[in-house]
Amino acid sequence: MIDKLEDVERRFERLTADLSNPDVLADSARLQKVSKERAGLEKLVEAFRTYRKVLADLSEVEAWLGSSDADEKAFARESLPGLKEQRDELEASLKILLLPKDPNDEKNVILEIRAGAGGDEAALFAEEVMQMYLRYADRRGWKADILDMSPGNAGGVKDATVTLSGDAVFSSMKYESGVHRVQRVPATETQGRIHTSTITVSVMPEAEDVDVQVNPADIEMQVMRSTGSGGQSVNTTDSAVRLIHHPTGIVVKCQQEKSQLKNRTMAMRMLRAKLYDIEQERIRNERDSARRAQVGTGDRSEKIRTYNFPQDRLTDHRIGLTVHNLPGVMAGDVEDVITACRTFYQAEALKAQTAGGPKPSA
């Protein structure tokens, strides 16, 4: 591990030197690339330097155990447990930081939320979950845009598409893909019976032009007037755009902007993300076919979480996590849940790496 860490440190130092290179400073694209790579290594290098200092301190303190000076010997005995604990914690952190990075982690995301089983109650919950993610995005300092939204018959939303942009959005949001189940007594329930409804959340990394090539000849564009709640027209021009990708049958729609050109640009972002997601899923299926039968994967059809309102309980079925703070969670306080998912999958990846098996995808 030390050899690998020293290689990373040397690379970090070269990148740091490049930031003072006039040729790099004159090339904005190259400067951005160097800055981004250096930032990605900084946390690992800082941890390694701290680890190296702790090892040096530990070696020095262990030498004091053989000292003839009683005070030095007593100090060594007192200091050793803390230094060993610090060493072990840093080793664990470094192993995590050395895990292969998900190439999509730094990407923005396109988030789709769809009401599933449960009728009107599912639509109401779909809107609540959308608002939960919008509040979480606000806490993280991300930019959120609702690209498209279809209202439910009795409130809520049948489906919604949202973009989240900011620092490493996919690295956090990727754990949210799957079926979310809600158990509660609907406001219209007169007998006090608990109903179960479901929604589906899809989190796709936003693809760039270099990630996926789209043949314009494969796309049919349709324009229409934007509609609001209840289906009424909210625009007197044909600004809403629907794109149909004939090879895959994918259909995307955007009516957020008043400009048809802007809506078409947004719709193309959605289409590229869906095509990229299909390709990524194909790769994951090939790579992880044996493991997927045993461990949760973020599959769209996998029930990942239950929100039980009568018991004030959130359960994440993939990792066995239970949280009793539903009001806080629905208000956007989901960081602890996401962190628990990240920790679980990192531990699984370490196990797989040690055993030489396929790395879990999450």
Curated annotation (Swiss-Prot):
Keyword annotations: Cytoplasm, Methylation, Protein biosynthesis
Entry-annotated residues carrying N5-methylglutamine: 232
GO MF annotation, one: translation release factor activity, codon specific
Cellular localisation: Cytoplasm
A GO cellular component annotation in the UniProt record: cytoplasm
InterPro entries tied to this protein: PCRF, Pep_chain_release_fac_I, Pep_chain_release_fac_I_sf, Prokaryotic/Mito_RF, RF-1
Keyword Cytoplasm: yes
PTM per Swiss-Prot/TrEMBL: Methylated by PrmC. Methylation increases the termination efficiency of RF1.
Family to which the UniProt record says this protein belongs: Belongs to the prokaryotic/mitochondrial release factor family.
Protein's job: Peptide chain release factor 1 directs the termination of translation in response to the peptide chain termination codons UAG and UAA.
Protein name: Peptide chain release factor 1
